[in-house]
């Protein structure tokens, strides 16, 4: 019998954008600017029309021709700050006066990033790699005794990059990373635009915990106990608890370089950032 878990999409947050600076297969390749916040996001939908049409030969449907439209991403957001509005719509903003100048614009391509979530609380981190924003409408109304207020609706038309990525040999429209599988490091996912070539699997390192004759020190990660069977990853933080009833020394080594830290109190916690295979040794001090 097949066991199936039913989930629905419920949650979206963290909408950011970054200008696409270059997109080619030459020296520059695919490059972008630094991501910036757009506005709070209430709802996001993506649509893509796919058309399949059969062509007839020898009195039978012999060939199917398939075509795809650009992606249309519709985003309901809070009021967009005027400087951000100018940036994403290709208009002018004067920082010295706080003035948006509406007029002839210079449209630019942007990548957008955001986080979606399902009803199981599992997040998907997304970067859409190339597209252009419309100029969103703005509705303003008088303040009355009600609670009505207006956000804005952005429409982002997404296309495929001209740049062909090494991983696939093709361009890409977007990447979607399931964080629940814990296969990649997503700590800095939105610090820069991610592509098929920048996403790589986590490299698991080993940890060896050695106890002294009467020590009972322990190691935790994210509030969970770490054992010799626990995989550890680069840049993760381990908390080392070298505790026993007497004074204890703690030694940890990485790549054969031993470092000793003396714990005179017997119960001080040390933090350690993983850099490679790690050995943590607890031993008694007379």
Residue ranges, per PLM feature:
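Polar/acidic, low-complexity leader/linker segments enriched in S/T/G and N/D
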Residues: 1-45
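Mixed-charge, glycine-accented linear interaction segment located at domain edges/termini
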Residues: 131, 135-202
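Short, solvent-exposed loop/edge segments of extracellular or virion-exposed proteins
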Residues: 206-227
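Surface-exposed interfaces of beta-sheet-rich extracellular modules
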Residues: 236-265
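Oligomerization/assembly interface segments of phage tail-like spikes and tubes
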Residues: 60-85, 148-161
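Extracellular modular ligand-binding repeats in secreted and cell-surface proteins
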Residues: 220-247, 274-276
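Short helix-loop boundary/capping segments
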Residues: 103-142
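Conserved "repeat-terminator" motif of extracellular CCP/Sushi domains
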Residues: 204-211, 242, 264-286
